[in-house]
Each structure stands twice: as C-alpha cells, then as structure tokens.
C-alpha cells in the first residue's frame, strides 16, 4: 500500500481494530520474539551466495537480534489489553506493518493509528510500548520472510533501522487521544507543560482509569469538563476519580 494513501491506511486501521474483541489483559508473547531472533541468527550463519537477500541478513543480523532483545525487555512485564491469544498492541503493530507492506514510515503509521484509534483508542501504556511492539512485529516478520522467499527483507530491515530515530520516538504523543483531550484545557495549562510533565499527567489519568474501571478517554473527558466548569484549575492537580 502506498505511503501517501493515508485514507486507505486509516480505513484499514479502523477495520483491523473493529475485528478485535478485548477479552482481558495479558503479557506479550515474548517467547515468539526470542525464537524469531534466534532463527535469524541461525539462518544468517547458513547464508550462501545463492541465498536470496542473504547479504541483507548477514549485514543486519546483529542489529535485528539486538532489536529483538530490546523488544523483549520492554514488553515482558507489561500487562496490556488482550484480544484472543494476542495483545491488542501486538495486533495493531502487526496490522500496521502489513498495511504498509513492510515499509514503515511515520506518515503511514500516523494514518493507520488514526483509523485504529477511531475504533479502539490505545491506552497510555500501549502507546509507550508502540516502538518496541513494532520492533517485535518486524523481527517476527523477518524470520517468516527468510523462512520463505525473503523478498520482503530489504523493506523490513530498513523499517527496523528507522524505528530507532527520533521521529518514531515522538509518534506516540502525537497519536495520543488522551493528550488531545487534555490539550483542550480552556486556560492552556496542559499545552504549556513540558513533555515530561504532560507524560506524568497522562500516567495519572491512566492510573485513575485502572482504579475506577473507566476508560482513559472517559477520565480525560471528565477532567476537561471539570476544568471548563472551574476555569481550568483541576489541570494543576491530579484529576479526581469521582464523578
């Protein structure tokens, strides 16, 4: 799918999200990520001049294995929403990679995530794990590619390297629906905060959502409504869990 076809990417993201049913919480299948990294290392040792895209694997093996390790370290303790036998975050990342044909760009990711979150907004913790989730998706896709014809390998390796750039690090906040709600603060307190303070505030909203059983979107909308009624003062303190 072409990078510039943002409408199609957004529509695909929404379709993918609507196909999911949240069934609880679980940890990511980090064993699958480890196995994919080990498979790439094993296949790299067996590369011959005749191996399709074998040089790509030789040149990038260490980087791919390191990315697999980074993804495992980030994901292994996180309990995020589940859908069937996978996490919603994992399904989102795999769907994005598939929609991009393995060639990730920030522009394409923003379009897909807009559509995905129209149907299923990502939680603060899920957004924080977006890059590790995408690293995991790419590493697993690479292992699958080299188990077949490896045609997708160049695009996948290029995507994996791009995920380490600053542009991808900033993507999560730009796609954060809770932050967008809080940014409508009538006196401009939230938008004036530095990045670390905004992140702390979103984490506070996330904790209140877990404590009360409400969604983060509901908590953020409640905070905004209270701020509008009291000229924004509630955005200087922790949002209240009470209605």
Question: At which residue positions do the language-model features occur?
Answer:
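Soluble N-terminal domains of membrane-associated systems
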Residues: 150-235
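Short acidic, glycine/proline-enriched loop segments that cap or flank alpha-helices
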Residues: 84, 99-107, 122-130, 166, ...
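Active-site activation/catalytic loop segments of kinase-like enzymes and analogous catalytic loops
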Residues: 86-127, 134-148
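ATP-dependent phospho-/nucleotidyl transfer catalytic cores
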Residues: 16-83
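Short, charged/polar, low-complexity loop and linker segments
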Residues: 46-49, 115-119, 177-185
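ATP-binding pocket architecture of kinase catalytic cores
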Residues: 1-7
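Conserved small/polar residues in nucleotide/adenosyl-binding loops
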Residues: 236-243
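Active-site-adjacent "gating/activation" loops or surface patches in catalytic cores
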Residues: 73, 83-91, 238
